[in-house]
Design a protein with these regions (language model features):
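NAD(P)+-binding Rossmann beta1-loop-alpha1 motif at the extreme N-terminus of oxidoreductases
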Residues: 5-77, 86-87, 356
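Electropositive phosphate-/nucleotide-binding environments in soluble metabolic enzymes
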Residues: 34, 38, 58, 85-89, ...
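Rossmann-fold dinucleotide-binding core
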Residues: 132-227
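Alpha-helical phosphate/pyrophosphate-handling elements in metalloenzyme active cores
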Residues: 235-249
Length: 382
């Protein structure tokens, strides 16, 4: 790993025209106090950054300051005394590394608001969501790169259930087109005691998270039909996103590693997976608009799958299962027809550097079968 630290007296280093702070003792801001944003803020504080967690309202900030706990999203985790908590109204002028713990749908609007409140363009900005940005289904890192330039943008993926990440660690992946930015973020997490891989493939890492959420939703929607159906649904979704990722120039390792299959298996095994639970509720006939309230948090996959289906179609990718899942969410396809589609679809034979979509489907079917169980386990908040 390249060492991006500079002597404290030097203060800052210039890398590829980007001014990067010495991470240790410098200021990081996490925007968004959901389960994952809160967990990341705790880890950053442990990793030596002077960290601020920003909530949507001052009332929320006051609650967290008084209780030293995010009881709604991360119960049982004591917030470090050194973690500063404030609302987004406080602005970002002090931030030297910015982490966005926001749903993908909120990124464009929120970044515009934050720019007006002092977000500087010459600091690294890290996307942490696992979805697509409306209306065109763009990846979060690409939306940010359009505003700030690709050398200042990074993203995070991998199996990272928030509660477990704080207590027992996780296996994160940080990706950026700028290797030195990836080094910087990796260093902070390693100092916090979290395994963190780095890559120059933000497209692959983000699509791995998108595929994982969509596949978990699909598995939940077919769970009542058996493990084979659930595994097939997840495998088909993953294979279709795989083909799309190939067209965007992503690396196979990104989807086959921690950010893709690793994240999906963690979600499938998790006792509280939001996206899989949403699929179960969808199959039970709960109206899609009511599902987030039933689960208690935003469901990234419910919003992302229609965008994903559209993006795959525009890219010319054959994606019958993703398209069918989008129709199921919209109430345009009955559940029995969705299940039949999953059972009868044969993956395309498109190839990607020696790998076939069918081989990916087989891997996913194996990964999603759970020995000695009769149904997929219950939800992850990553």
């Amino acid at each position: 790993m390249a060492d991006v630290r500079q002597p404290r007296a030097a203060g800052r280093s210039t890398i590829n025209s980007l001014v990067l702070p010495n991470p240790i003792g410098r200021r990081a801001i996490v925007v968004g106090a959901g389960s994952f944003g809160t967990a990341i803020a705790v880890l950053l504080a442990r990793g030596g950054l002077r960290t601020t967690l920003q909530t949507r309202t001052e009332e929320q900030a006051e609650q967290l300051r008084e209780s030293h706990e995010n009881a709604r999203y991360l119960p049982g985790i004591k917030l470090p005394q050194e973690l500063r908590i404030e609302s987004v109204e406080s602005g970002l002028s002090r931030g030297e590394i910015i982490f966005l713990g926001l749903p993908s749908r909120a990124i464009t609007e929120t970044v515009a608001e934050l720019e007006a409140r002092g977000l500087r363009r010459r600091v690294p900005i890290v996307a942490m969501s696992k979805g697509l940005v409306p209306p065109d289904g763009q990846l979060p890192s690409r939306v940010l790169a359009q505003r700030f330039g690709p050398l200042r943008v990074a993203c995070i993926g991998g199996p990272a259930h928030a509660q477990e990440m704080v207590n027992d660690g996780a296996a994160l992946v940080v990706a950026s087109e700028n290797e030195n930015v990836a080094n910087l973020i990796q260093q902070v997490f390693l100092r916090a005691g979290v395994v963190c891989e780095k890559t120059l493939d933000p497209v692959g890492v983000e699509l791995g998270g998108v595929a994982k959420n969509a596949a978990a939703l699909a598995a939940g929607a077919t769970e009542a039909q058996g493990l084979n159906a659930a595994g097939a649904a997840a495998g088909h979704i993953f294979a279709e996103v795989w083909d799309y990722a190939a067209r965007l120039g992503a690396r196979p390792q990104s989807l086959l590693g921690l950010a893709g299959i690793g994240d999906l298996v963690a979600t499938a095994l998790a006792p509280h997976s939001r996206n899989r639970r949403a699929g179960e509720l969808l199959a039970a006939g709960v109206p899609p608009a009511e599902i987030p309230a039933r689960v208690g948090q935003a469901i990234e996959a419910m919003e992302t799958v229609p965008l994903l289906a559209r993006a795959l179609s525009l890219a010319g990718v054959q994606a019958p299962v993703t398209s069918g899942l989008s129709q199921l969410i919209a109430g345009e396809l009955p559940l029995d027809e969705w299940t039949q589609l999953v059972r009868t679809t044969v993956p395309s034979t498109s190839r990607w550097r020696g790998q076939t979509s069918r081989a990916v489907t087989a891997r996913m079917r194996d990964a999603m079968r759970f020995k000695g169980t009769t149904s997929l386990p219950p939800e992850s908040d990553s």
